[in-house]
Amino acid sequence: RRSMTDSSGHLVEHFFRHESAHLIAVLTRAFGIRRIDLIEDMVQVAMLEAMNAWKQGGVPDNPSAWIHRAAKNRILDALRREKTLAQAISLAGPTLDVQENIVEEWLSEEQLPDSLLRMMFVCCHPTLNRETQIALTLKTLCGFGHAEIAGGLLLPIETIRKRITRAKRSLGEANVAVELPCPDEI
């Protein structure tokens, strides 16, 4: 374990943005686009837990694995707590145990690029307009905040927030699969 110092703040921020994109891509693929808000929330919780734990106990030898496991466990815990667990399981897949195994496989180094590419196609779904595609991609895959996106696109923060919220709702209602499109669709 390595100690976490104030000077490593920029590295930690970069690491978290990078890992956040991987996690959101993999977990959305596993649990479905309808769960993207829960997934983003639980990834943030895992990141906060990491910051707190690492300040006290140092950075683990494999910080990526630590965050991946924490985020996955938070989502599984949240799904177990849902009032309509049967509905959650039917939306998420066959069983939570099967989902857990799938997530482990998809978090492997070989699978991460595919998951990110799949998520990029979801963020750029043809039902979304170009500006919304850009905002959703910057938020979901690049880890930018609403204010950063708004500043870059020269739009009010609230406009960006609403676009991203509507895009997630639209993709969820359409139950867009987190898969690669057919070659003739590209």
Where would I find each of the regions flagged by the language model?
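DNA-recognition helix of helix-turn-helix
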Residues: 153-174
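Acidic, proline/glycine-rich intrinsically disordered inter-domain spacer in sigma factors
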Residues: 10, 93-119
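Short, basic/polar amphipathic helix motif occurring as a linker/hinge flanking DNA-binding modules
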Residues: 68, 78-100, 179
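Short amphipathic alpha helix immediately N-terminal
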Residues: 127-144
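Short, charged helix-capping/linker segments at alpha-helix termini
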Residues: 5-14, 24-43, 53-61, 157-158, ...
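Structural recognition of an alpha-helix C-terminal capping motif at a helix-to-coil junction
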Residues: 41-48, 61-73, 162
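Helix-turn-helix DNA-binding module
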Residues: 4, 142-159
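Hydrophobic-face residues of short alpha-helical interaction/recognition segments
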Residues: 23, 27, 67, 71-79
